[in-house]
């Protein structure tokens, strides 16, 4: 049943742009349709009644809750650290996205974590930002994403956008 729900969730997301569904539906309905089944924190917003409440897939949900509470985020259209988020969705520091990736990979809820990871890291075309020496190129690229950046260590670090790892 979880595999079927996960597949339906991915199908729904494949017709969306960022976290927003293109169909005309109400805000409450949107939030309910975009939260991964069996979780309260995995998706657009959350459905929890408080920070300690988790859904049926507690390990996956805990990863999503921690990710949602990242202290360094940039909302759509916001400028911060000398960067502007031109995406239609919130972007996070690479540190938070890396921790989210590792948490999902190590989760005891293997199937739900797999689908949430695939959705966030593979389907949603997003980037993260971090303080790093200026990027001079990409040493290795796959599926349109840079896997290994080359940097100029002779110059001071600046905030820049980076591709997320594939899940």
From Swiss-Prot:
CDD domains given in the database record: PLA2_bee_venom_like
Chain residues that bind Ca(2+): 41, 43, 45, 68
Domain of life: Eukaryota
EC numbers for this chain: 3.1.1.4
Processing after translation: N-glycosylated; contains mannose, N-acetylglucosamine and fucose alphal-6 and/or alphal-3 linked to the innermost N-acetylglucosamine.
Keywords (A to Z) from UniProt: Allergen, Calcium, Disulfide bond, Glycoprotein, Hydrolase, Lipid degradation, Lipid metabolism, Metal-binding, Secreted, Signal
Propeptide feature ranges: 19-33
GO-annotated molecular function: calcium ion binding; phospholipase A2 activity
SUPFAM superfamilies: Phospholipase A2, PLA2
Location relative to the cell: Secreted
Cysteine-cysteine disulfides: 42-64, 63-103, 70-96, 94-128, 138-146
Alphabetical GO biological process terms: arachidonate secretion; lipid catabolic process; phospholipid metabolic process
Residues carrying a glycan: 46
Cofactor field: Ca(2+)
Cofactor binding remark: Binds 1 Ca(2+) ion.
A Gene Ontology cellular-component term: extracellular region
Major subcellular site: secreted
Signal peptide positions (record): 1-18
Catalytic reaction annotation: a 1,2-diacyl-sn-glycero-3-phosphocholine + H2O = a 1-acyl-sn-glycero-3-phosphocholine + a fatty acid + H(+)
Tissue-wise expression: Expressed by the venom gland.
PANTHER family noted in UniProt: RH14732P (PTHR12253)
Family: Belongs to the phospholipase A2 family. Group III subfamily.
Function: In vivo, intraplantar injection in mice cause spontaneous pain behaviors and paw swelling. PLA2 catalyzes the calcium-dependent hydrolysis of the 2-acyl groups in 3-sn-phosphoglycerides.
Note: The secretion of this protein into venom follows a seasonal pattern. This variation is synchronized with melittin variation, i.e. their production increase in the same months.
Protein name: Phospholipase A2
The species this protein was found in: Apis mellifera
């Amino acid at each position: 049943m979880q595999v079927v729900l996960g597949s339906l969730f991915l199908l729904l997301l494949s017709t969306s742009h960022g976290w927003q569904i293109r169909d005309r539906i109400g805000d409450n309905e949107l939030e309910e349709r975009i939260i991964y089944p069996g979780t309260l924190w995995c998706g657009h917003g959350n459905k929890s009644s408080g920070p300690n409440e988790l859904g049926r897939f507690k390990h996956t949900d805990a990863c999503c809750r921690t990710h949602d509470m990242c202290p360094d985020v940039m909302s759509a259209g916001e400028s911060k650290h000398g960067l502007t988020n031109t995406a239609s969705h919130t972007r996070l520091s690479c540190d938070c996205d890396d921790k989210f990736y590792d948490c999902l990979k190590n989760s005891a809820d293997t199937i739900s974590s797999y689908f949430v990871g695939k959705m966030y890291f593979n389907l949603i075309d997003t980037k993260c930002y971090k303080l790093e020496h200026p990027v001079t190129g990409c040493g290795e690229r796959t599926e349109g994403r840079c896997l290994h950046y080359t940097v100029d260590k002779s110059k001071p670090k600046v905030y820049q956008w980076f591709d997320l790892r594939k899940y």
